[in-house]
Design a protein with these regions (language model features):
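Interhelical loop and helix-boundary elements at the membrane-water interface
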Residues: 10-52, 70, 74-110
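Alpha-helical transmembrane segments
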Residues: 2-12
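Transmembrane helix interruption/hinge and helix-loop junction motifs
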Residues: 1-3, 56-65, 107-108
């Protein structure tokens, strides 16, 4: 697939995984600064980033990109939840990662 095709798929997947597939519960539960009683924040964060990383793996075929997505997405979302970065910065980091994964996927020989 071309860079633009992969990038479009990654952006669509990101929109799905960061909004309807995350939902209100995971969005709140992953915040360690305002935890939901009885719900370990790290389990909610793990569920969210595994969904994100899974889409990256399925679309790019790259386990390395998926692992990088998992780690970077978790760190970025935690920084947003802890008010160290803004929502817009969070989304910009996510989209820059998608550009990187699309580049890797488009330039990797199958």
């Amino acid at each position: 697939m071309s860079f633009w095709h992969v990038l479009a798929l990654l952006i669509i997947a990101h929109a799905l995984a960061d909004y309807p597939l995350q939902g209100d519960f995971l969005s709140k539960a992953k915040n360690r600064r305002a935890p939901i009683p009885g719900v370990p924040w790290y389990q909610a964060m793990a569920a969210h980033v595994v969904i994100q990383a899974g889409f990256v793996w399925i679309i790019t075929g790259s386990a390395a990109c998926a692992v990088a997505e998992l780690v970077i997405h978790a760190v970025t979302d935690d920084a947003k939840c802890c008010n160290r970065i803004s929502f817009n910065t969070d989304q910009a980091v996510h989209l820059l990662c998608k550009v990187a994964w699309a580049y890797v996927a488009a330039h990797t020989v199958p």
